[in-house]
A protein has these predicted regions:
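Generic detector of well-ordered alpha-helical segments enriched in charged/polar residues
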Residues: 25, 29, 33, 48-52, ...
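Histidine-centered, transition-metal-coordinating active-site segments
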Residues: 2-13, 168-171, 183, 216-240
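Divalent metal-dependent catalytic cores for phosphoryl transfer on phosphate-bearing substrates
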Residues: 83-220
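Short linear sequence elements within intrinsically disordered, low-complexity coil regions
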Residues: 33, 59, 210-213, 231, ...
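Acidic/His-rich, divalent-metal-binding segments that scaffold phosphate/diphosphate chemistry
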Residues: 2-144
């Protein structure tokens, strides 16, 4: 079989111009922009429609560990800090940092493992604008009315919360539901309970969720090390 055509002794494919990282990041940001804008403009009607659409299971009954494995195929097209690294690697980055800092309590390990499970919607054809991005309350809810009494933009947080509530402690379910909440802009509508959970849970977790993201840090600890944690918390398949 004839090999690839060579010009001047070089494979012609190697002569194709390569983007610098700066150019690649600029293209990434350009592609992310419209997604972020669509999410920013998400209306009350759109949120209600998404809630109705996803009131039923999408994948049927599935083991939570399998969902975590599927995160290996999920790429957030708007996350410039991860820059194409999978959500499963992101989970491992969080866990590695917690272990290093001595903050890997059983509760924080569990929420790190499951907080982004809703991003499997990226594999179903759903518009990424309805899956990723940060959230804020929609409209002008009274100050201190409580997050549960507000309409918040819809994304993977709410999808996963609806599947996990009742299966994990209430505090952790709350954290899954609101881990993408923009702070401090969303604090105005929080009630006393929300504010307490924000200080105790959301702020510490957000530190790891955001600060550990990198396309260059690939933790050596295998995810399999945490399988027993997942199987103990979810001994049976769940509707997802």
């Amino acid at each position: 079989m004839r090999g690839p055509f060579r010009a001047g002794g070089h494979d012609r494919r190697s002569l194709a111009p390569r983007r610098t990282e700066e150019e690649a990041r600029a293209l990434f940001a350009l592609q992310a922009g419209p997604i972020l804008e669509r999410h920013r403009r998400q209306s009350l009607e759109a949120v209600m429609a998404l809630k109705a659409r996803y009131s039923r299971p999408v994948l049927g009954q599935v083991r939570v560990w399998e969902l975590i494995e599927r995160l290996g195929s999920c790429i957030d097209p708007t996350d410039e800090r991860l820059f194409g690294v999978s959500q499963q690697v992101h989970v491992r980055q969080i866990l590695a940092a917690m272990e290093e800092d001595g903050t890997a309590t059983p509760e924080m390990v569990l929420v790190a493992l499951v907080h982004d499970l809703g991003k499997v919607l990226l594999l179903t054809g759903e518009d990424p604008a309805n899956v990723v991005c940060m959230n804020t309350p929609i409209g002008q809810a009274p100050a201190g009315s409580g997050l549960a009494n507000c309409v918040v933009q819809w994304n993977h947080d709410e999808f996963a919360y609806d599947r996990l509530k009742g299966l994990i402690p209430d505090d952790l379910a709350w954290l899954v539901r609101y881990h993408s909440l923009e702070l401090p802009v969303s604090c105005r509508v929080m009630d006393a309970g929300d504010l307490e959970r924000t200080e105790r849970l959301l702020v510490p977790f957000a530190h790891y969720d955001h600060a550990t993201k990198s396309p260059y840090v690939l933790p050596s600890t295998p995810l399999e090390q945490y399988r027993d944690v997942v199987e103990e918390a979810f001994p049976h398949p769940i509707w997802f």
